Structures are given as C-alpha cells and as structure tokens.
Design a protein with these regions (language model features):
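Acidic interaction surfaces
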Residues: 1-98
Length: 98
C-alpha cells in the first residue's frame, strides 16, 4: 500500500484532516489532548497520547465512517497518535491550543 498526501493511506489522512481542519473537531481535540495526557500520567503511564486514546478521541469526534466514506478500520492509529502528540507538544510549548 502506498502513501496518500504524506500519510500511510487515504483513511488516515482523511481522519486527521477532519480533526485538524474542521473548527469544531479541532477545538474538541485540543480540549481533550491535555486531559488525556494528564489521565495517562496520573495512572503511572507517560503523559502522551497512545494509539487507543487517538482512536477513541477520533471516533468521538469524527465517527466510524467519515462523510465521504473513509472507515476507522482502515486508519493507522499509531500515525494519528503521533500527530496528536506533536499537537500536544506545540500546545505545551506555545500555551493553549495553537
């Protein structure tokens, strides 16, 4: 399988696009990321976003299928978690959401 717009596949790109580029989704994600990281830290884990966290958050915001048909089952959740951790780092560095 090839890449799509720099992401592992179209579904991964599409889910992150909806999280990053739709105002309501972006605000929801930015509100939740620090809370998820804190919950992980408080439970003795690293204060990061794990694959399961990324999947759960994206499913809450986007759903199991995007409006144009990308399926959650096709998403590389590790890649989404990595992107969310980058956003979380930027939020910490610059304060609040960026």
């Amino acid at each position: 399988m090839g890449t799509y717009e720099g992401w592992k596949n179209r579904a991964t790109w599409n889910y992150m696009l909806r999280l990053n580029n739709e105002h309501a989704g972006y605000r929801a994600m930015c509100n939740e990321l620090p809370l998820i990281a804190k919950r992980n830290r408080d439970s003795g884990r690293n204060a990061i976003i794990y694959k399961a966290d990324a999947m759960q958050l994206a499913l809450q915001i986007v759903g199991i299928i995007t409006p144009d048909g990308s399926r959650a089952a096709d998403v590389d959740w590790g890649e989404i978690a990595q992107a969310m951790n980058e956003i979380l780092r930027e939020m910490k560095r610059y304060g609040g959401d960026h």
